UniProtKB/Swiss-Prot annotation:
Family matches, as Pfam families: ACAS_N, AMP-binding, AMP-binding_C
Name used for this protein in its record: Acetyl-coenzyme A synthetase 2
Lineage, broadest ranks: Eukaryota, Fungi, Dikarya, Ascomycota, Saccharomycotina
EC number: 6.2.1.1
Positions with a binding annotation for CoA: 207-210, 326, 540, 611
Ranges of Basic and acidic residues composition bias in the record: 14-30
Amino acid sequence: MTSSPTHQVVHEANNIKKQETPKEFFERQPRQGHITSLEQYQELYEKSINDPETFFGEFGKELLHWDRDFERVKSGSLLHGDAAWFIGGQLNACYNCVDRHAFATPNKPAIIYEADEEKDSKILTFAELLREVCQVAGVLQSWGIKKGDTVAIYMPMNSQAIIAMLAVARLGAIHSVIFAGFSSGSIKDRVNDASCKALITCDEGRRGGKTINIKKLCDEALLNCPSIEKVLVYERTGNKEVTLKEGRDYWWSEETQKFAGYLPPVPVNSEDPLFLLYTSGSTGTPKGVVHSTAGYLLGAALTTKYVFDIHPEDVLFTAGDVGWITGHTYALYGPLSLGVPTVVFEGTPAFPDYGRLWQIVEKHKATHFYVAPTALRLLRKSGEQEIEKYDLSSLRTLGSVGEPISPDIWEWYNEKVGKGQCHVTDTYWQTESGSHFIAPIAGVVPNKPGSAAVPFFGIQTCLIDPVSGIEIQGNDVEGVLAVKDTWPSMARSVYKNHTKYMDTYLNPYPGYYFTGDGAARDHDGYYWIRGRVDDVVNVSGHRLSTAEIEAALIEHNAISEAAVVGMNDDLTGQTVVAFVALKEHLIANLKADESPEEALKLKKEMILQVRTQIGPFAAPKSVIIVEDLPKTRSGKIMRRILRKIAAGEADQLGDITTLSNPQSVAGIIGSFDSQFGKK
């Protein structure tokens, strides 16, 4: 490791001390860690890069069950977009996640389902899971679903969603999960793009104490989905007013009871697709990312085991939805492939109160907790009193996913939730990567709050100069984050549109995988994610990372969340506009005071915060105080909407019903127009 240079490009690394894993982490391990030293990680990483055939070949045989052994570990390249792994092998993902564990440990919990209302919760053992998966697979098989067919799943985060995914995989078919929050139009687009033959859904959903009419949305979508032949409807609430279309729709309970006994899984080739997952937030036609069976499954198992330091005795609580990649990889395929119980949570962090997540951790003695920073910000806003009610001493690893975690949230997570006794694992990856790209391996890699740390096995991260397209060498540098070689769990294509796949990920920098994110590598070789490269503001020739400015703003003790966008300016090209949500008690104080002077004072402090932390060139020209920022159902801030508002295009926002808080948009428009004197 080198010492810090006098002038740092990566200023985030200033005054950040490395934090070693606390001794309590090791005391809570059920057995010795899978990796016991930083040197061992470095040796394994070097082997994974220099000899990937041997490295991944050994792990492929260790972690997966094969119906037919593979003949070759890898082929193809990023340049040609023809990556393939474990050629000649055959396996079944469902068998790997269910059968082998049901035979070995039939009474071990597989799915720990925590419903929106606790009274509806249930635990499924591996034996019970196998039985229910075989029943649903039997229904699908009787409908003619076979290897290579696509099946859409539109369900809330419950046990049946997991069962449905596994049942589809059991037949060698391809599941396409659609987040149960998308509109009927979004369902239609995804079903049609994937040419789905069947849909699995439910009558209604429960979330945050509210009932959601899931079946009604599906019915609206299916008016224009000619490929759908059959629909299986799980009775989540049992509302008798929910109706079925004769000849198309069938009740889950009635159909599954027709099938009993063991239904053998269908072996598929390593490169056969396991699932499609449509990326969210983009305009135009949906983009169905294709993941293979063997490579994806190995990536899920390998990262779950090593990044989190997961053991058979552990319990993984991933507070994510199967409608997104986090739920696929770390609520289903990662833990279940290893025979580790997974907590499936249907509800929200705030219902019935802000202690719900911690109550679940205590109840099931979860050892690993994995959540998005958005949820952590919400929970910090509510105060620590709810955390103190529960015994969280079972926790060993605290994970973060979905967006960069700011140092202040990292510290809060570490101190208030983990009591300074856990390893915080900030993970960087994507829908397209399938599994973790960059993460500090639990119990091994020292942490720097705000940094995702170092690359995982087989991931050759690098930084590219966006102007020259040349790889940037050395440390204390910044550029576009890319990967130099294929890895097992990488997405293989965009469904029915390989040209789009090439143009989006592989052609921008030939020979590299383009992540779309900017990043920096500090003097120790740690990576700092700076957000999407299109989330850049160009002010007077200065290319400013919005994530960087947001991180500076968040350090102001009044701010709960911040989002920065660029706004056109005749003089400087663009100016920085910051939308900030205040902590609850400050919102109340401002409303009670109704004093513009107090708000103005706060805004000046925020601008000064950025001037001091980054420099005058990065200071926002305008700060808009709002009650809430627009977010997707997965918790990501929709900066696209804020950019439209700042551009004076509030009448061109498109469909905002898929937001978790669409009501926030009108308030933001009002605050923006008020500040800029618009009627």
